[in-house]
């Protein structure tokens, strides 16, 4: 023992003389812990379930709104003949921010060269462009009207179309799709003639 009367080694208690822990008290503590843990987990699962239900409802509302918008746009007569020119300068300015000036000058030079090349190719071949294709024209019209591009991309993917062609309205329609579009347009023309 030191000068204060405290033991130098160990607790100084003879463990053989200490009474046993009361089992009822241990069981009560354990039961209280289990009850509180289960209540916490129940509250947590209820909150998670409520948030998931709210999110599911919002997704259904957005899907319904998108379907209504799609129906409204498809009911507009003459929408198939609309051609839309998307300016690459606007897209570059939005995506690159501070580098927009130098990039826009480069894209302007590239687009001038590309348009010159396309003008020389266009008369030599009768190519169906994205802007003239009725399947893509309605999506280009949606972009012009101001529908969010991500929603249009999702809709195009669901219909099996390439959403990258929204940015290139003067590009030729991919091979398989142009033949299908010509067949569909000829089928629709023949159905009107009957």
Curated annotation (Swiss-Prot):
The modification N-acetylmethionine is found at residue 1. InterPro entries: WASHC3. The keyword Cell inner membrane does not apply. The keyword Nuclease does not apply. It is found in: Early endosome. Residues 94-126, 158-194 are annotated as: Disordered. Keywords: Acetylation, Coiled coil, Endosome, Protein transport, Transport. Pfam families: CCDC53. Residues 114-126 have a biased composition (Polar residues). GO terms for biological process: endosomal transport; protein transport; regulation of Arp2/3 complex-mediated actin nucleation. Residues 98-113 have a biased composition (Low complexity). Residues 46-74 form a coiled coil. GO terms for cellular component: early endosome membrane; WASH complex. Belongs to the CCDC53 family. Component of the WASH core complex also described as WASH regulatory complex (SHRC) composed of WASHC1, WASHC2, WASHC3, WASHC4 and WASHC5. The WASH core complex associates via WASHC2 with the F-actin-capping protein dimer (formed by CAPZA1, CAPZA2 or CAPZA3 and CAPZB) in a transient or substoichiometric manner which was initially described as WASH complex. Acts as a component of the WASH core complex that functions as a nucleation-promoting factor (NPF) at the surface of endosomes, where it recruits and activates the Arp2/3 complex to induce actin polymerization, playing a key role in the fission of tubules that serve as transport intermediates during endosome sortingg. This is WASH complex subunit 3. The lineage of its organism: Eukaryota, Metazoa, Chordata, Craniata, Vertebrata. The gene is Washc3.
